[in-house]
């Protein structure tokens, strides 16, 4: 991959990490997050796999914009929860792709549609105008095409790409005074924290089994259980399940022959990161995916430093 795009990916992830976990943290959490940040960096260097630039094509851009538009219509129009909306769009995209049987415009449309859906989860307290969110979804689709040879098999790539698209579009929206003050973060109770950790541990494993053992594919493996959980769980906890499912989208060749200890470690980190997430501007679409990617890179970085790449 050309260096500017590699630096852009690293830069956006760094900004996300600093804003979400480091800035304003007390001393002990600050030291812990700083150490974890070094492990994330090690994982990024060992597993970023920045290959050549991907092919430019309007199809993923349009499909991602459709995903963002669908979630916007469901959330801001029909007042469906953002988790339920994104999961529903992901399920539909994955099923349509499977029905296309590898031909036609939807032969690989599930990933860009899901990526665009994450951009569409952006809160109206962050970006008020749906037009800017739609532009962020389209940009996410463009970036996904350009970055097709990077982060292959890394859980959280789709969400991180959506986050990048929304942030870059948000910078332009801010210049036009269209940026809000940010959404309010949910304060988890003691009981909710227990459920949060349980969800963060279970979701990656279930997603990984559905995606790779049952061969449903990563989009349906993530979206289907997330849709079910979103029907029965409060939105903040359903969001944790959805984010944990992104961890489970990590490909087997990124893990060892025994993937589940790594997935549990990644899920636990995702849960802890979710509890410590305090960004200056909450509610940006794709932040769950970026948190998942940070968790995946941290565990992969630890394993790379201790044992080298997976055997």
What are these regions (language model features)?
Residues 1-42, 53-65, 71-72, 77-87, ...:
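C-terminal transmembrane helix-loop-helix hairpin of multi-pass membrane proteins
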Residues 48-52:
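Glycine-rich, hydrophobic membrane-spanning regions of integral membrane proteins that mediate transport
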């Amino acid at each position: 991959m050309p260096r500017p795009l590699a630096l852009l990916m690293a830069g956006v992830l760094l900004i996300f990490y600093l804003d979400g976990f480091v800035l304003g943290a007390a001393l002990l959490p600050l030291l812990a997050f700083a150490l974890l940040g070094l492990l994330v960096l090690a994982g990024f260097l060992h597993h970023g796999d920045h290959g050549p630039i991907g092919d430019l094509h309007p199809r993923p851009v349009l499909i991602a914009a459709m995903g963002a538009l669908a979630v916007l219509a469901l959330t801001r129009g029909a007042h469906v929860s953002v988790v339920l909306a994104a999961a529903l769009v992901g399920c539909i995209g994955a099923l349509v792709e499977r029905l296309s049987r590898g031909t036609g415009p939807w032969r690989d449309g599930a990933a860009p549609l899901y990526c665009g859906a994450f951009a569409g989860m952006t809160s109206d307290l962050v970006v008020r105008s749906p037009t800017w969110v739609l532009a962020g979804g389209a940009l996410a689709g463009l970036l996904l095409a350009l970055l097709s040879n990077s982060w292959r098999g890394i859980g959280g790539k789709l969400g991180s790409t959506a986050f990048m698209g929304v942030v870059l579009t948000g910078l332009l929206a801010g210049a036009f005074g269209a940026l809000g003050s940010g959404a309010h973060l949910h304060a988890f109770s003691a009981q909710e924290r227990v459920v949060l950790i349980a969800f963060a541990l279970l979701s990656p494993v279930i997603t990984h089994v559905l995606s790779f053992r049952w061969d449903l594919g990563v989009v349906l493996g993530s979206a289907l259980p997330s849709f079910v959980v979103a029907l029965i769980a409060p939105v903040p906890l359903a969001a944790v399940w959805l984010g944990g499912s992104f961890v489970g989208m990590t490909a087997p060749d990124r893990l060892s022959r025994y993937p589940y200890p790594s997935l549990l470690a990644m899920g636990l980190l995702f849960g802890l990161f979710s509890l410590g997430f305090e960004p200056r501007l909450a509610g940006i679409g794709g932040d769950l995916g970026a948190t998942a990617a940070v968790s995946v890179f941290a565990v992969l970085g630890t394993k790379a430093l201790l044992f080298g790449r997976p055997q």
